[in-house]
Amino acid sequence: MRLEKKNIHMNKIVKSETVIFFVSREERIMDADNEIENIINQKEIVTTDGVVTRENQITVNGTINYNILYYPKNSEMVCGEEKEINFEENIKLMGINSEDNANVAMEVLSSSIKPVDGKNYIYKIQLKAYIIVEKIEDLDIATAIDTDSQGENYENDFAKENSGKNNVENIMTKKRNIDSLAIMADKTDTFRVSEQIEVPHGKPPIGTIVWSDIRIKNQNIKTMEGSIIINGQLSVFIIYIPEMENMPEQWLEQTIDFNGQLEMSEATEDVVSYIELWLNNVNVQPEINQDNEMRNLSVSALLKLNVKLYKETSIKVIEDVYKPGANLVPIMESKTYQKLLVKNASRTKEVVKMKIDKTKGQLLQICNSQAEIKIENILVRDNSLKAIGKIKTCIIYISSDDRHPICCQCRESNFEHGIDAEGIEGNDEYFLNWKVEQVNANMLNADEVEIKAVIALEAIVFKKVEQNFVTEINQEPVDMEALNSAPVLKGYIVQKGDTLWKLAKENYTTIEKIMTVNNLENETIKKGDRLLIIKSCQA
């Protein structure tokens, strides 16, 4: 007997690991006239350019874009260094193969610059790779009996007449609902932001940009029919040397709004989406305005999206089959599917107080403040996912030191936050991402600064469900003696655990006939009910 089956297209996590490794290079100062005296600040953007999956191994290719802000020995004007390093890392992961799909997200744990001499330095960065290896798995589940099934062999004429193979419309099927989650799309895409900022007239035109820091703020992503809508802001901060000589360093901080959409045929308003967005590449260049002055700032940012779209489906699957006078035996097999347990987002505000290093002079003015989150561990606890790590807050400020007025100070504090995930268990699969949405800093006094940061976390949790499913239905010989010895008419008192399905199958009748004879409006029965059961067939 052939069965109609429905396919569930699933993305299952094969391996989820974090790996720490180092990248080290010896570099030379680009400006041949400069030698580093004092490093003010440094930052990195690490991008994953490609991942190749092999047997028990992945190869990660990436790029490190780093900036150094420093004071040189031969000048009191601040200088900047921007460079790019390509790297390749082979990572052992047992149990994976070339057909699996690996996603790798990079996080900077630490970085250092060790001078070799005035011109050369060793740049060393510690990276943490968040690796998730997935594979596509298709689950076929029986939802109905194929009404075109025919042309089978039977052990006798009675079996042929009652088997339901040439007469499948008389077969009764017992079904149950399962709520499953199918993967609709798993892809990466890019979104480019290109805007111009005008330098206010109160500030001098740009000569040379020595430091730029671009970050995403307040992002909002949603799915629509056939597209993904993206909204957010870019926080732009630069330090520059003016065109005019003998003018002090200047800084500029502005916010750029961006919005747009990406076409994606799988997207609908009701899909379950999990979309990560991060900066992949940034370029900031001064440009001449209509007055022939360097007062325009061209900002170009390439945003990378990792898009996963899921669809929740309620499916009625065959649990049992029966036909009076036939012996139909369902063959069962244990299979695992996944359903959506929860998708949740949470925000928390962190307040950090920072004492200013007085050896750098008194704090006069805060130019810029930033924060970064580094998650070290994720625990499944008390119906929640708990993220534990560090928050690093930094300010760039102007001090009373006339020789080196631009300073930077950072502080690292403990971070812990839970996001509700009702019903989560240790073996459930999940994705969790985090980002800093807003940062601002205020001077409490000349010696202390208060930094407030809003941290957003988003989680999606999948519940693994293992159940028995009908894979095929066999016909076996009918026990003619049992069939003929069963009473044609029977009075019965309902016992605990009885259902109409159970009683019909045991007494060679149908649910419909029991309901008709006993004037039942629905299939609900309870212990103590009295029923009249009439057999529907006889050999």
How would you label these PLM feature ranges?
Residues 2-486:
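Membrane-lipid interaction segments
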